[in-house]
Amino acid sequence: GCNDVLEDGFTDGDNDGLLGNSPVTVDSLGVVTSGSDGYTDPIDGDNNGVRDYKEVGAQVDLVSNPTSMTISEQLIAFFVASGSTTAGTMVYQWQESTDGGTTWIDLVESVTYVGVDNDTLKIINAQLEISTYKYRIVISSPAFVCDVDVYSDPAEIIVLADNDKDEIADVDDLDDDNDGIYDTEEDTTDIDGDGIINSFDLDSDGDGCNDVLEAGFTDGDSDGLLG
């Protein structure tokens, strides 16, 4: 269903399967002279050694969409999507939107984004700054130039603050600074006016003596944390 002229990487403006636009003109050797290109090496989009015009290709289909997720900061987020095709190969490309899905950019493999070109995207050490960002996958068939790229539904990441980095988000953590004193006891005021709320502050009154000790608990290594 995809004409050779297109699979070769050439131009067929009127989509009649002939090089260039009709009517076609040729020289004495039968070479088309009315086209703007042609007669160069045909393309091999998937680099498998078979020219695309000799290789059966097919449209890709979306099988599954990624799922939105909520995690604590500095943890790993996973997004999974998949596609299928009856012939040829598929190429995956994950994209990110920082503006609610209005614009999208291709992700590049890095220490933060792993697996940008396969069915599973990992976001390593997720930071608060990416909360509400959206992610989607684009699936295409490199050996089938007539295919239409398939886009998954977007999935959103929500990253929750975790003051003590114990992998329990503050919204769920009963002790946000791990000093052994419940947040309900310490509350969210700022007794010493240092800009750190009491439930995050290891020395809430600013007297130089950590809360864990003033509460009568044990702090063997004097780091302000219980134990």
Task: Report the location of each language-model feature.
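Solvent-exposed loop/turn motifs of extracellular immunoglobulin-like beta-sandwich domains
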Residues: 127-134
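Short, solvent-exposed loop/turn segments at the edges of extracellular beta-sandwich modules
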Residues: 140-148
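Surface-exposed, proline-enriched loop/turn segments that connect beta strands in immunoglobulin-like
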Residues: 63-68
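Solvent-exposed loop segments of extracellular immunoglobulin-like
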Residues: 85-93
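Extracellular calcium-associated, cysteine-rich motifs in secreted modular proteins
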Residues: 1-60, 146, 157-227
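Core motif of extracellular immunoglobulin-like domains
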Residues: 81, 94-95, 135-137
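Surface-exposed, flexible coil segments in extracellular/virion-facing regions
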Residues: 98-125
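A short beta-strand segment in extracellular, disulfide-stabilized domains
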Residues: 75-83
